[in-house]
Structure formats: C-alpha cells, structure tokens
UniProtKB/Swiss-Prot annotation:
It comes from Rickettsia prowazekii (strain Madrid E). One of its GO terms (molecular function) is small ribosomal subunit rRNA binding. Keywords: Ribonucleoprotein, Ribosomal protein, RNA-binding, rRNA-binding. This is Small ribosomal subunit protein bS6. PANTHER family: MITOCHONDRIAL 28S RIBOSOMAL PROTEIN S6, SMALL RIBOSOMAL SUBUNIT PROTEIN BS6M.
Amino acid sequence: MSFYESVFIIRQDVSLNDIDKIVDDFTKIIKDNNGTIIKKEYWGLRTLAYKIGNNKKGHYYFLGIDITSNVKEELERKMKLNENIIRFLTIKADSISSEPSPILKNQSTENTPVIDVTINN
C-alpha cells in the first residue's frame, strides 16, 4: 500500500449534504478494499482560477489516503464518472502529515472548514 493525496473540486451548486454523500462513496470504496483514510479536509467554496464549464467557483475537498494502486485507479474512475466533480488530481506521497494543510492554516477563522484526522498505527 502507498500514500496518496487526492484533491477534487465539486460543482458550486452542489449542497453540503450531497458533498458528504460523494465523499462517503469514496470512503466506502477505500475501506472495502482495506485502505485507510488518514486525513479528510473540506477546504470550502473557493473561486476557480478560470471558468470550468459554467462554474466560477467550486467546493474543494482533500483526502490523504493509504491504498493500493488498483484502488487509486478505481477512485479516479469513479471521479471521472461523477458529473458533480469538475476536476481532480491524485498524487503519490511519501507520507501524510496529521497537521492541517497550509490551505487551512491560511484561511480566516470565520470560514473554519472541517478537518478529520485519523492516524492508524
């Protein structure tokens, strides 16, 4: 198993409940294949650098995961098929830090996003 960091952008008009359902679907795939979710972060609704389709903003979500390459391919396949996800990127990492990501550290306290860190030894 290897560490991966995955960031995906969900359309701006998707509700927070629907975002939770999307993330739960990915979580189920990971756990069903003996993977581990080390860190989940919702980075909030952010303005995109350029318009993607009709979207000027998007909900950013980060997953720090420990999975096999086959599970990574399955997650990416599901992301491609989900019409609510407008962009995604998954990269291999040496390790996943339990600290909040730099994006969370730079955000103002009035927009406090959700962070869920689980370290399994």
